[in-house]
């Protein structure tokens, strides 16, 4: 028999206000907290390095919650604290992780990626291909944003995402740096070493000129359509194609 630590909380106006405020980066940083919504994604937290403060749920029968403090709430209360348009039945309150770099052979470097869905998808792709770290420029969308967390489908628990000055990172590294560009060597004719950085640029502007100067090799995904009217690929689509090609040779 499974015993859960069940609590009937008093969801005060103050608590609700704090949880609602976590939709914004400045309050996530102020309280050092972010929300994870939905049983499927919360399940991924169990074997991760993230610390779960507590869970609010309308369904207390989930055995995955047994190691967490779990608060039984009503549907009405759930709608008040959820940051999603269509609330899931459970919300985990988690602590932000330290912005600490790890050693990983292949690392993605994101230059000013702004769309939450793109960042979430790229994190999910990194998890799929076994890439352990993504380095984001300091002006990238915050990966603790609810839409990013949802788009990762739990992959954020297995990929280390950090924010730093990417120009300084690349300048001080001896790794080859591959940059995605509309003009460059064909992806399908490029040989990738064991250790390297792969830069993916902003949705509308690509990689910034000052970062382009630090690229060792520009690569491009060639177009095969007869009319070739498509101007560019979505950054997360491009990431999927490039990673698929890289790992097809391993």
Where do the PLM segments sit?
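Boundary-proximal intrinsically disordered activation/regulatory segments immediately upstream
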Residues: 3-58, 141
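Amphipathic alpha-helical repeat scaffolds
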Residues: 38, 114-122, 230-236
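RNA substrate-binding interface of SAM-dependent RNA methyltransferases
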Residues: 47, 101-185
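Active-site regions of enzymes building and remodeling cell-envelope glycoconjugates
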Residues: 65-76, 105-106, 177, 191-197, ...
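Glycine/small-residue-rich loop that forms an oxyanion/phosphate-binding "nest" at active or ligand-binding sites
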Residues: 72-94
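Short beta->alpha connector loops at strand-helix junctions that form conserved
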Residues: 73-74, 111, 137-138, 160, ...
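Structured adenosyl-cofactor binding patch, chiefly the S-adenosyl-L-methionine
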Residues: 128-129, 143, 148-157, 209-250
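Active-site/ligand-binding-proximal alpha/beta "capping" segment
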Residues: 179-229
């Amino acid at each position: 028999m499974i015993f859960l630590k069940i609590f009937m909380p008093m969801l005060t106006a103050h608590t609700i206000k704090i949880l609602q405020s976590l939709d914004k980066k400045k309050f996530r940083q102020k309280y050092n907290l972010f929300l994870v919504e939905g049983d499927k994604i919360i399940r991924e937290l169990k074997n991760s390095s993230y610390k779960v403060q507590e869970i609010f749920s309308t369904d207390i029968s989930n055995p995955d919650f047994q190691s967490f403090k779990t608060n039984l709430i009503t549907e009405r209360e759930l709608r008040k604290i959820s940051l999603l348009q269509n609330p899931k039945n459970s919300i985990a309150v988690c602590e932000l992780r330290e912005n600490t770099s790890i050693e990983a052979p292949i690392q993605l470097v994101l230059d000013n990626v702004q769309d939450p869905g793109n960042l979430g998808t790229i994190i999910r792709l990194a998890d799929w291909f076994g890439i352990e770290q993504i380095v984001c420029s300091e002006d990238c969308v915050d990966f603790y944003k609810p839409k990013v967390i949802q788009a990762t489908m739990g992959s954020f628990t297995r990929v280390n995402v950090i924010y730093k000055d990417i120009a300084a990172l690349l300048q001080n590294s001896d790794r080859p740096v591959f940059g995605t560009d509309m003009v460059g060597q064909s992806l399908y004719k490029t040989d990738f070493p064991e250790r390297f950085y792969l830069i993916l640029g902003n949705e509308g502007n690509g990689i910034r000129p000052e970062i382009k100067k630090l690229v060792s090799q520009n690569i491009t995904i060639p177009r095969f359509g007869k009319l070739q009217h498509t101007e560019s690929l979505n950054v997360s689509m491009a990431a999927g194609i490039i990673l698929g090609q890289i790992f097809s040779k391993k």
